[in-house]
Amino acid sequence: MGKALPYVELPLPSSELALVRPACYFFLMTDTEALSLKGRLLVAMPTIGDERFERTVIYMCAHSHEKGAMGLVLNKPVDGVDFRELLDQLKITEVAIDKLPVQYGGPVEKTRGFILHTTDYKSDGASAVSEEISLTATLDILRDIAAGCGPDRHFLALGYAGWAPGQLEDEIKANGWLVADGDAGIVFDSAIDAKWDHALASMGISASNLSSSGGRA
């Protein structure tokens, strides 16, 4: 297995460092006891109650009632973190691609790197999340991306969102997030500022259809 991505020493903007998860997220989903959210999208409702989390889309990488849940925020850019500087810090010298957006993945381990990518890329460190998407957190994939021989599509994030066992199930019952299919097009191709709208559209709804009480209109 490849060496895990080390923690990034580049300072994050103070606004990002202050980004903490509110006391309670809100979700809307039926049959919560039977359905795993792994490989799906959590889409923030207008009633989220915290402007720092408005229009948030989270790709769920793991979820079980015994171990809790883990996901990556898809639409919160990290300003002030340059990909080329990151490569220099990690002593990656074979560089054909030196420009790649660095996204904010969540409030846990905010300087640790995680890469979502298409399953055409195979490595010992890759963990399949769905038929189309894998998660890798090793230096090997970052080297390959920089060298131009990485996966067809990829998404680099710092940090992740995590839930203790039972926490996510409790939050789902509060009715304030929607759950959408984990469309690879939304994960990799949609513009950052369009992911929320595209995730809603994948369910056949728009922001104007959402009721102020947290469910569908």
Model-assigned labels for residue ranges:
Residues L5, F26-L28:
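Short hydrophobic targeting helices and cationic amphipathic motifs
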Residues L5, L12-P13:
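Short, often N-terminal, low-complexity regions
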